[in-house]
Amino acid sequence: RSSAASDVYKRQMLMGVKVLDHIAESRDLPSGIDQRSPARHPDWLGPDDLAVKIEQIREATDGRIPVSVKLGACRVTDDVKLAAKAGADIVVVDSMLAGTGASGEALLDHSGIPTVPSIVMAREALRDMGLYGTVSLVASGGIRSGADMAKALALGADACAIGIGALVALNCNRDIPEADFESEVGVSAGQCHHCQTGKCPVGIATQDPELEKRLDPSEGADRVANFLNSMTMEAALLTRSLGKGDVRSLEPEDMVALTIEASAMARIPFVGTNKVFGWD
C-alpha cells in the first residue's frame, strides 16, 4: 500500500492506539484494536432507512429529545427535503468551510458548498415543503465570530454550530511551550491535522495520559466560555445596531452584498442597488 493509500485507509479507521480501556468500555469495543469508522452509516442506505433510524432514536429516547440529521453541504436542496420528510426535527447543514482534523487537502479545498449558499438553499427547501419554522435549521462550517453567526441567522438559520472555533479556543494548533509540533507530528503549529493519530501535541485529540496533561480542562473551559460569550455579545451588538432587540428578528433584508458573487449566493441585493445578481 502506498503512503497516500495508507493515509486514506487510516482516515476511515478509529486507530487502535486511541481505543484505550475506558474508551473500549464506553463503546463496547476490544481495547487496542483498529475499528472501522466509515464515512456513511453502514445500517442504512437511503431515505427509507433514514426514516426508520430516526424513529428508532425517537423510541429509544421516549421522544424526549429532538432528532437531528447532519448533512454535508452537497446536494443541499434534495438532502434537506429528504431529511425533513424522514422526520428530522433538526437539519444541520455542514458546509465546505467547516474544519476537520482528519481529511485530505483535496477534499478540504475542492468539495462541498460554502456556508452562505448552503443556508439559503436549505431555507428554501424547507419553505418549499411548508416546514420552514417547524423543522429547525442549523448552520455549520466556518462560523468563527458573532458577525458570522448574525449573518447566518439573518439568512435563515435558527442556530449555528461551532466546531473548530471552540477547538482553537482550547489551544488546537497553538504553539504552546509544552508542545514541539515539528518533532512530534512533523509539521509546524497551525498545520497539524493529526487528530486521527492520537498524538495531539496540545492534548485535545488524544487518549495518551502524558499528552492529556498538556490541556488543563478548567482553563480550557474558561477560554471556550469566553469565546462563546464574545460571539454572543458581538451578534447582539450587530442586532441592536439594526434597531432590533432579538437575534431571531434578523432577516435577509438587513443585509446587502459587497460583491456580485455574494449577491448571487446569498440572494440579497448588491450594495447601492436593488439588484440580486443571478436571480432577477
PLM regions: where:
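Single conserved hydrophobic/aromatic residue that forms the stacking wall/gate
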Residues: 1-5, 9
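Long alpha-helical scaffolds
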Residues: 4-5, 88, 157, 262
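Short, glycine/charged-enriched hinge/interface segments at domain edges or termini
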Residues: 11-14
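ATP-dependent carboxylate/acyl-activation modules
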Residues: 19-27
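Active-site-adjacent bridging/hinge elements
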Residues: 27-30, 97
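Short glycine/proline-rich turn/loop motifs
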Residues: 31-35
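Glycine-rich phosphate/ribose-binding loops and adjacent secondary-structure elements
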Residues: 36-212
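C-terminal extensions of enzymes
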Residues: 208-280
